[in-house]
């Protein structure tokens, strides 16, 4: 929780109580001075500050500047965690062990990215272990958004000295269920500008 973050974001702008739980801003730093800024509302990435080939730092991920914009975003999955189930489940239903489950729908007749109040819209319990590591925890109740089983999720963000952001997802459940978590990052490798540049001049090596 650093008000002098390289990204310019302020912890105070992310501090609010939502549903009885407090939101905040967490800054991870590595030995290179690079930063990742994360809020525990939806586990959203709000800034990733890294240098270009000339050593100029820029934010390369789309994120919001304050908690109110996160909550009221017209793009609710902007760089957030997604769950219980990333992508669409057709017609908002699935079968498991011979039983059909009906889910909350938010994409026409389909269930998308965990539903209207999926993991992206939840306040996670947060523990910053050190400068490099943030651990988020959330317990998804039985039948939340229509899914069977109580699901306990732990997501660990690790920001390495190689400028790698490692996201580790672990879940335990008390009943057979389906889980397909992901992070819905919106990247712009040329840096977030105004207007934001397109990807047409970006060379990506995989």
Model-assigned labels for residue ranges:
Residues 2-206:
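An exposed, glycine/acidic-rich loop-and-rim segment of catalytic or binding clefts
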């Amino acid at each position: 929780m650093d008000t002098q973050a390289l990204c310019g974001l302020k912890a105070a702008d992310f501090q609010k109580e939502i549903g009885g739980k407090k939101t905040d801003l967490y800054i991870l730093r590595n030995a290179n001075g690079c930063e990742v800024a994360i809020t525990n509302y939806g586990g959203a990435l709000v800034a990733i500050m890294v240098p270009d080939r000339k050593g100029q730092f820029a934010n390369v991920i789309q994120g919001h500047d304050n908690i109110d914009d996160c909550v009221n975003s017209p793009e609710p999955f902007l760089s957030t965690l997604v769950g219980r189930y990333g992508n669409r489940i057709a017609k908002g239903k699935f079968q498991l062990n011979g039983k059909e489950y009906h889910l909350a729908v938010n994409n026409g007749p389909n269930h998308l990215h965990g539903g209207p109040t999926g993991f992206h819209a939840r306040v996670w319990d947060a523990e910053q272990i050190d400068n490099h590591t943030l651990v988020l925890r959330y317990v998804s109740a039985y039948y939340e958004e229509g899914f069977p089983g109580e699901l306990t999720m732990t997501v660990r963000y690790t920001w390495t000295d190689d400028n790698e952001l490692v996201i580790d997802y672990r879940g335990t459940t008390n009943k057979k269920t389906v889980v397909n978590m992901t992070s819905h990052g919106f990247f712009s490798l040329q840096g977030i500008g105004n207007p934001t540049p397109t990807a047409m001049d970006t060379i990506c090596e995989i």
